A protein has these predicted regions:
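ATP-dependent adenylation/nucleotidyltransferase module used to activate substrates
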Residues: 1-125, 135, 143-146
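Contiguous mid-protein beta-loop-alpha structural module that forms a pocket-lining wall or clamp
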Residues: 118, 122-168
Protein backbone atom coordinates (compact mmCIF):
# COMPACT_ATOMS: atom_id res chain seq x y z
CA UNK A 1 0.00 0.00 0.00
CA UNK A 2 2.83 2.38 0.86
CA UNK A 3 4.56 1.69 -2.47
CA UNK A 4 1.36 2.42 -4.37
CA UNK A 5 0.66 5.58 -2.35
CA UNK A 6 4.13 6.84 -3.21
CA UNK A 7 3.43 6.13 -6.88
CA UNK A 8 0.36 8.36 -6.69
CA UNK A 9 -2.41 5.78 -6.37
CA UNK A 10 -5.38 6.28 -4.07
CA UNK A 11 -5.33 3.15 -1.92
CA UNK A 12 -8.03 1.32 0.04
CA UNK A 13 -7.06 -1.54 2.35
CA UNK A 14 -9.23 -4.63 1.92
CA UNK A 15 -9.03 -7.82 3.97
CA UNK A 16 -10.98 -10.96 3.13
CA UNK A 17 -12.22 -13.17 5.96
CA UNK A 18 -12.48 -16.61 4.42
CA UNK A 19 -11.89 -19.28 7.01
CA UNK A 20 -11.64 -18.22 10.60
CA UNK A 21 -11.90 -14.93 12.40
CA UNK A 22 -8.51 -13.26 12.51
CA UNK A 23 -7.17 -10.47 14.64
CA UNK A 24 -7.30 -7.59 12.21
CA UNK A 25 -5.85 -5.00 14.57
CA UNK A 26 -2.46 -5.02 12.80
CA UNK A 27 -4.09 -4.45 9.42
CA UNK A 28 -6.33 -1.73 10.84
CA UNK A 29 -3.31 -0.06 12.47
CA UNK A 30 -1.36 -0.14 9.20
CA UNK A 31 -4.27 1.41 7.29
CA UNK A 32 -4.66 4.06 9.97
CA UNK A 33 -0.94 4.82 9.86
CA UNK A 34 -1.16 5.16 6.06
CA UNK A 35 -4.33 7.23 6.43
CA UNK A 36 -6.26 4.97 4.05
CA UNK A 37 -9.74 3.46 4.42
CA UNK A 38 -10.01 -0.14 5.64
CA UNK A 39 -12.68 -2.62 4.55
CA UNK A 40 -13.27 -6.21 5.55
CA UNK A 41 -15.25 -8.48 3.24
CA UNK A 42 -16.70 -11.74 4.53
CA UNK A 43 -16.40 -14.74 2.21
CA UNK A 44 -16.74 -17.82 4.42
CA UNK A 45 -19.54 -19.51 2.46
CA UNK A 46 -17.98 -18.88 -0.94
CA UNK A 47 -14.65 -20.19 0.36
CA UNK A 48 -16.28 -23.34 1.74
CA UNK A 49 -18.19 -23.99 -1.49
CA UNK A 50 -15.39 -23.21 -3.94
CA UNK A 51 -12.29 -24.36 -2.05
CA UNK A 52 -12.87 -26.46 1.07
CA UNK A 53 -15.56 -28.83 -0.20
CA UNK A 54 -13.80 -29.55 -3.55
CA UNK A 55 -10.47 -29.92 -1.71
CA UNK A 56 -11.90 -32.53 0.66
CA UNK A 57 -13.64 -34.38 -2.18
CA UNK A 58 -10.47 -34.46 -4.30
CA UNK A 59 -8.28 -35.51 -1.39
CA UNK A 60 -10.65 -38.35 -0.48
CA UNK A 61 -10.48 -39.50 -4.11
CA UNK A 62 -6.71 -39.79 -3.89
CA UNK A 63 -5.96 -36.61 -5.83
CA UNK A 64 -3.59 -33.84 -4.79
CA UNK A 65 -5.56 -30.60 -5.07
CA UNK A 66 -4.03 -27.14 -5.24
CA UNK A 67 -6.37 -25.07 -3.06
CA UNK A 68 -4.42 -21.78 -3.25
CA UNK A 69 -4.77 -21.61 -7.03
CA UNK A 70 -8.47 -22.38 -6.83
CA UNK A 71 -8.97 -19.87 -4.03
CA UNK A 72 -7.29 -17.07 -5.95
CA UNK A 73 -9.30 -17.73 -9.09
CA UNK A 74 -12.70 -18.54 -7.60
CA UNK A 75 -12.77 -16.63 -4.32
CA UNK A 76 -10.17 -13.96 -3.52
CA UNK A 77 -10.07 -12.19 -6.87
CA UNK A 78 -13.84 -12.51 -7.32
CA UNK A 79 -14.45 -10.83 -3.96
CA UNK A 80 -11.80 -8.18 -4.63
CA UNK A 81 -13.36 -7.48 -8.02
CA UNK A 82 -16.79 -7.09 -6.38
CA UNK A 83 -15.40 -4.61 -3.85
CA UNK A 84 -13.56 -2.69 -6.58
CA UNK A 85 -16.67 -2.55 -8.77
CA UNK A 86 -18.87 -1.41 -5.86
CA UNK A 87 -16.43 1.40 -5.10
CA UNK A 88 -15.72 2.33 -8.72
CA UNK A 89 -12.05 1.38 -8.35
CA UNK A 90 -10.11 0.66 -11.53
CA UNK A 91 -7.20 -1.42 -10.21
CA UNK A 92 -6.86 -4.32 -7.79
CA UNK A 93 -3.50 -4.59 -6.05
CA UNK A 94 -2.17 -7.52 -4.06
CA UNK A 95 1.05 -8.40 -2.30
CA UNK A 96 1.83 -11.35 -4.56
CA UNK A 97 5.43 -11.69 -5.68
CA UNK A 98 4.58 -11.75 -9.40
CA UNK A 99 4.75 -9.36 -12.31
CA UNK A 100 2.08 -8.67 -14.90
CA UNK A 101 3.16 -7.99 -18.47
CA UNK A 102 1.08 -6.76 -21.40
CA UNK A 103 1.81 -7.51 -25.03
CA UNK A 104 -0.47 -6.65 -27.93
CA UNK A 105 -3.43 -6.13 -25.60
CA UNK A 106 -3.01 -9.47 -23.81
CA UNK A 107 -1.87 -9.75 -20.21
CA UNK A 108 0.53 -12.38 -18.88
CA UNK A 109 1.70 -13.44 -15.45
CA UNK A 110 5.47 -13.32 -15.08
CA UNK A 111 7.66 -14.64 -12.33
CA UNK A 112 8.58 -12.20 -9.61
CA UNK A 113 12.18 -10.95 -9.29
CA UNK A 114 12.77 -13.07 -6.16
CA UNK A 115 13.28 -16.69 -7.29
CA UNK A 116 12.75 -17.88 -3.70
CA UNK A 117 9.33 -16.21 -3.36
CA UNK A 118 7.85 -16.23 -6.86
CA UNK A 119 4.07 -16.76 -6.64
CA UNK A 120 3.14 -16.79 -10.33
CA UNK A 121 1.83 -20.35 -10.05
CA UNK A 122 -0.89 -19.25 -7.63
CA UNK A 123 -2.40 -16.80 -10.11
CA UNK A 124 -2.23 -18.94 -13.26
CA UNK A 125 -6.01 -19.23 -13.66
CA UNK A 126 -6.94 -15.55 -13.53
CA UNK A 127 -8.90 -14.36 -16.56
CA UNK A 128 -7.78 -11.47 -18.76
CA UNK A 129 -10.44 -9.17 -17.28
CA UNK A 130 -8.77 -9.46 -13.87
CA UNK A 131 -5.16 -9.47 -15.08
CA UNK A 132 -5.91 -6.20 -16.88
CA UNK A 133 -6.82 -4.64 -13.51
CA UNK A 134 -4.04 -6.25 -11.46
CA UNK A 135 -1.22 -4.33 -9.79
CA UNK A 136 1.50 -6.41 -8.16
CA UNK A 137 4.19 -3.99 -7.01
CA UNK A 138 6.08 -6.51 -4.86
CA UNK A 139 6.99 -8.60 -7.89
CA UNK A 140 9.75 -6.11 -8.68
CA UNK A 141 11.50 -6.71 -5.33
CA UNK A 142 12.90 -9.55 -3.26
CA UNK A 143 11.16 -10.43 -0.03
CA UNK A 144 14.27 -9.31 1.84
CA UNK A 145 14.14 -5.90 0.15
CA UNK A 146 10.45 -5.49 0.99
CA UNK A 147 11.00 -6.37 4.66
CA UNK A 148 13.97 -4.00 4.92
CA UNK A 149 12.02 -1.23 3.21
CA UNK A 150 9.02 -1.77 5.52
CA UNK A 151 11.25 -1.59 8.61
CA UNK A 152 12.96 1.61 7.37
CA UNK A 153 9.57 3.21 6.81
CA UNK A 154 8.21 2.52 10.29
CA UNK A 155 6.48 -0.82 9.71
CA UNK A 156 8.73 -2.99 11.88
CA UNK A 157 5.83 -5.21 12.97
CA UNK A 158 5.00 -5.98 9.35
CA UNK A 159 8.66 -6.62 8.56
CA UNK A 160 8.88 -9.16 11.39
CA UNK A 161 5.57 -10.88 10.65
CA UNK A 162 5.76 -14.62 10.14
CA UNK A 163 5.28 -15.83 6.58
CA UNK A 164 2.20 -17.69 5.44
CA UNK A 165 3.16 -21.23 4.48
CA UNK A 166 0.32 -22.77 2.60
CA UNK A 167 -3.21 -23.71 3.38
CA UNK A 168 -4.54 -20.45 4.76
Amino acid sequence: ALLLRRQGYEVIGVTLELWEKNDLSGVRDSCEKLNIPFLCREGHELFRQQVVDPFVKAYRSGLTPSPCCICNRRVKWILLQQVADELGVEYIATGHYVRIAEREGRFYIRKGIDPQKDQSYFLWGLPQALLRRALTPLGEYTKKQVKEWAARNGYEQMARRRESMGIC
